[in-house]
Amino acid sequence: MKKTAILLLVFLCQQANYAQTTKYSTSWFGPNANPVPEFTDARIPSKTTVSLMADYYFGYGDQTKNGYFKIELPLLPERVSLKIWSTVLEHYKTTAEIMQKRGSSSVSGSEGGDIYVQTRIRLLKEQTNLPSIILNSTLKTASAKTFKTRRYFDTPGYYFDLEMGKSIATRGKFISEIRAVANVGFMCWETTNSTQDDAPMYGGKLIIGNPKWKLENTLSGYWGWLHTSTRLNPTADYGDAPLVYATKLTLVMGNIDYFAQYQYGIHDFPYHQLRVGISFPISKLTPKF
């Protein structure tokens, strides 16, 4: 019995020491672990909207392919909605160097992703001299099954953010609308030994187009505090302040939006992303109260 207790104590100490070397950040995990949150054009749809996407991340010793599913249900059309999304069937392949650097257990494999649940509330309707303002409250579940592969965190997280958007009508045929969107918020996630990493979120988006097409350019990121701590980050490489740039082209054909996106990790997000997808409304799934 005494021998068993000693072995158990040694095992727990080893696990604690091992866990403390894990950096819960975008620099040390797969691209879907804790990405920079996306934000919309500061509008809530009138009908339930489904989006289906395929992503390819590459560069810096990690190649990742995955599906992506998103659904937004307007509980009160254009005022309140519930949104759910998740990565689907992630397949990855890394170099041996990246595997060793992250402390991962495998260079390749497949994973299921985290599930996000978000409520969206319109605080202010867009008017001539006022922007629309949307409040988002988001919960990230720890749905992924395997932590040792360093694809997803084994801890939950949450964030709150405000989207503010305003359009200008140009009366042109090729470009009939210019819309500017700003995003500010606060993100929090749990790390080693219940230590919380807190981060202000920020972003800006410029959208141009007409009813048939639109082009979005987005710069966004968040700024975690753990990389600033000399005690918790003595090697100064925690990497929890990602900044990304994305450009997205959408073509509208009937009720279906077809889109393609390229995203570049400027800081603490060592990936390029290519995304293609479709988005469409489903009237029969729209709640009617």
Model-identified regions with their sequence ranges:
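Bacterial Sec-dependent N-terminal signal peptides
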Residues: 1-23
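Transmembrane beta-barrel domains of Gram-negative outer membranes and organellar outer membranes
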Residues: 20-141, 155-169, 213-246
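Structural signature of outer-membrane beta-barrel domains
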Residues: 57-59, 89-93, 138-144, 185-191, ...
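Residue-level signature of outer-membrane beta-barrel architecture
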Residues: 73-75, 121-123, 166-168, 206-210, ...
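Flexible, glycine/proline-enriched loop segments at strand-loop-helix junctions
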Residues: 147-151
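Conserved active-site loop/cleft motifs that coordinate metal ions or position small ligands
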Residues: 215-218, 248, 256-263
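Outer-membrane beta-barrel "beta-signal"
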Residues: 247-254, 271-289
